[in-house]
């Protein structure tokens, strides 16, 4: 997910996306531990998406204050 797309989402949508990505990250780590994960690059993609969302959430919070 690109930063531009993330910025267009509302705060509630961002929180929902963050939760969704965290669940996906959990499942990917579980697959990696059991040796079933084929696309290991997806782990870093999901982690970076979570970081992008958290960054934009904190920016929005600072704008409000």
Curated annotation (Swiss-Prot):
Which InterPro entries does this UniProt record tie to the protein? Ribosomal_protein_uL29, Ribosomal_uL29, Ribosomal_uL29_CS, Ribosomal_uL29_sf
* CDD domains to which the protein is assigned, alphabetical: Ribosomal_L29_HIP
A Pfam family matched in the record: Ribosomal_L29
A molecular function GO annotation: structural constituent of ribosome
Tell me if Ribonucleoprotein is a UniProt keyword of this record: yes
Which key words tag this protein in UniProt? Ribonucleoprotein, Ribosomal protein
Please report any disulfide bonds recorded for this protein chain, giving both cysteine positions: none
Q: Output the Gene Ontology cellular-component terms.
A: cytosolic large ribosomal subunit
Q: Which PROSITE patterns match?
A: RIBOSOMAL_L29 (PS00579)
Q: What is one Gene Ontology biological process annotated in the Swiss-Prot or TrEMBL record?
A: translation
Q: Which NCBIfam families match?
A: L29
**What family does the Swiss-Prot or TrEMBL record give for this protein?**
Belongs to the universal ribosomal protein uL29 family.
Alphabetical list of HAMAP family matching this protein: Ribosomal_uL29
Q: What is this protein called?
A: Large ribosomal subunit protein uL29
Q: State the taxonomy lineage.
A: Bacteria, Bacillati, Bacillota, Bacilli, Lactobacillales
């Amino acid at each position: 997910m690109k930063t531009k797309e993330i910025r267009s989402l509302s705060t509630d949508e961002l929180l929902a996306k963050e939760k969704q990505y965290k669940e996906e990250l959990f499942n990917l780590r579980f697959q990696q531990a059991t040796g079933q994960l084929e696309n290991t690059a997806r782990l870093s993609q999901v982690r970076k998406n979570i970081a992008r969302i958290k960054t934009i959430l904190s920016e929005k919070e600072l704008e409000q204050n």
